[in-house]
Regions:
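Helix-start/capping segments and mature chain N-termini
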Residues: 193, 226, 230, 297, ...
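Extended alpha-helical targeting/anchoring segments
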Residues: 1-351, 355, 469-471
Length: 553
């Protein structure tokens, strides 16, 4: 179906009191404006909407699966070498003055296995976006966890919030805050954001009442599970009589997914990209009677083709003269991490020593719990937590025990107790892990009920008390239930947190008191140290007997 006739049907439907819900693919841009260059063939319809007589409000995610695990093996449609060649070509065009910035993208593809709604639930849970959408058109299913508002219309008020500027999330709170500040102060990202915001101002100016275009927010930093994003807000008063086709012709595709200037950048995109974008970087949304509307930019979005049992997911970044190929490629990988990361349906956890009615290192436990809650976006009230623990302790008569405190995402606290007599503290046997952990795994830096890394390590070496972990650079990290300490010539050393390990509260206490020194420890050094200890706030120092482990086969 042609683009304008399709939107005329949408306009007719809303004029007759119906709601229209659907999507417009990136390749529809040529249908709005013929000189906007795109691919001419794709499996998806260019425009697809369905109509409803009424709309219902539902609780988001109420009918979706509660847990999700990725089932697809994703393959890039482009090699790193080809990616680099395309970035170099874009930079040459910038050098020649033909463009200032180009949004360069590629696809991840996979055979689709599993349930479409389960896949959608996983994306929503992993991305925590305000514009999630599930559209089932029979053969074609579009699932989106977009964080970016394309435009919203409420009466005569029009608002757009272009998103341009990205930095990966840190692995723990302090690193995370440092990365946020780096994005906010990044000259490259600020320049990109201003460029795209100016384009949006100009595009919206076509639709707006004279003098009404404003930019109330510039360089706002928004937090998402895998990345920090920089956004700006553009507002205007919509002129009388603007139809949905007028709005799309003026604004589509969103400037944040093309580059500047739009026409030449889209020509370059058509030259360097290998395949059509489809729904990716198009838009998804609804428009209702009277013209109220909300559309997202279709990023963090996948297209499932049921006939082919195939799923397609796009990623990209804005290439400028100052771009680093490695940094841009890493940004694309960061944006794709929501496809790979494990289900984050876990509680935050603290394991606490209770002695004679007193909690050992209570403030440090609270500090770590609060830090992780802030990082993951969990609800946490420190005073409520203190009173809950205090009330629990008052009811206990055991002189020495271990408390296990769990904090849910909604802020609910649960506590259970284990008598200390059942805890082995004299010495433990241990062996080196059979394979390395990934130092970039964020779960390593937070104490949670997701113990999959440690459970896997323990399962590979049975008949041993503990497993000593190391990362992909063969740097020793920690044990499954405690931090690593080694003694060398009378001094005590422990690996730095950046190697990929939990910042233990007893470890922090010992470092602050000058009894422990941070130092990178290599896997091949372990046999030459004088003594090895496992430490945590319940057991304190436990001597380790390191043995050669045998893999369970």
């Amino acid at each position: 179906m042609e683009v304008f006739p399709a939107l005329e049907k949408v306009q007719s439907a809303i004029d007759n009191g119906l709601f229209a819900v659907g999507f417009i693919t990136y390749e529809a841009a040529s249908g709005f404006t013929p000189y906007l260059k795109t691919f001419t063939s794709q499996t998806l319809p260019l425009v697809s909407f369905v109509f409803f007589a009424e709309r219902n409000q539902i609780i988001a995610g109420a009918e979706l699966p509660k847990t999700y695990r990725p089932t697809a093996k994703w393959n890039q449609t482009i090699s790193y070498e080809d990616y680099k060649a395309s970035v170099d070509k874009i930079r040459r065009y910038i050098e020649l003055g033909e463009t200032y910035q180009v949004n360069y993208t590629f696809r991840l593809q996979a055979e689709f296995k599993g349930d479409e709604k389960g896949f959608y639930a996983g994306l929503c849970h992993a991305q925590s976006s305000p514009f999630c959408a599930y559209l089932d058109f029979g053969r074609h299913v579009v699932v989106s966890a977009s964080p970016e508002l394309f435009f919203r219309i409420d009466g005569t008020n029009l608002e757009a919030r272009p998103m341009k500027g990205t930095f990966r999330r840190g692995r723990w709170l302090q690193e995370d805050e440092r990365f946020k500040k780096q994005l906010l102060s990044s000259e490259k990202d600020r320049a990109e954001n201003v460029m795209i915001t100016d384009m949006m101002r100009n595009d919206i100016g076509i639709l707006a009442q004279t003098g009404s275009v404003q930019v109330p927010n510039l360089f706002k930093i928004e937090r998402y599970p895998t990345v920090w994003q920089m956004t700006s807000t553009v507002k205007a008063s919509l002129r009388t009589g603007a139809k949905i086709s007028d709005i799309m012709r003026a604004l589509f595709p969103c400037a944040s997914v093309t580059g500047a200037p739009k026409v030449r950048s889209m020509e370059i995109i058509n030259e360097v990209e290998k395949d059509p974008r489809g729904i990716y970087t198009g838009c998804i949304g609804y428009v209702g009677p009277g013209g109220d509307a909300c559309f997202s930019v279709a990023i963090r979005t996948a297209h499932i083709d049921r006939n082919l049992r195939h799923v397609n997911y796009g990623v990209g970044s804005g290439v400028t003269w100052n771009s680093s190929t490695d940094a841009e490629f890493q940004e694309c990988k960061d944006k794709a991490r929501i496809l790979y990361e494990e289900d984050k349906n876990f509680d935050l956890l603290e394991t606490i020593l209770l002695e004679n009615g007193r909690i050992f290192l209570f403030e440090r436990h609270l500090d770590r719990l609060e830090s992780s809650a802030k990082y993951w976006g969990y609800k946490f009230d420190r005073s409520t937590c203190i009173s809950t623990i205090t009330d629990f302790v008052k009811m206990k008569s055991v002189q020495r025990s271990r408390l296990r405190l769990c904090l849910s995402k909604s802020g609910e606290i649960s506590i259970n107790e284990t008598p200390f007599s059942s805890i082995k503290i004299n010495s433990l046997t241990a062996a080196l892990a059979t394979d390395p952990i990934d130092r970039m795994n964020r779960l390593l830096f937070h104490k949670t009920t997701n113990r999959s890394v440690y459970e896997h390590a323990k399962s590979q070496i049975p008949n041993i008390d503990e497993v000593l972990l190391y990362n992909q650079d063969e740097e020793l990290t920690e044990f499954c239930i405690g931090n690593l300490v080694v003694e060398i010539n009378g001094d005590l050393y422990t690996p730095p947190v950046s190697c990929g390990l939990l910042p233990g509260v007893f470890r922090a206490e010992e470092i602050d008191n000058g009894r422990l020194i941070e130092r990178v420890l290599k896997k091949d050094q372990i046999d030459s140290v004088d003594k090895i200890y496992l430490i945590n706030s319940v057991r304190r120092y436990v001597p380790i007997d390191l043995r050669a482990g045998e893999q369970d086969v």
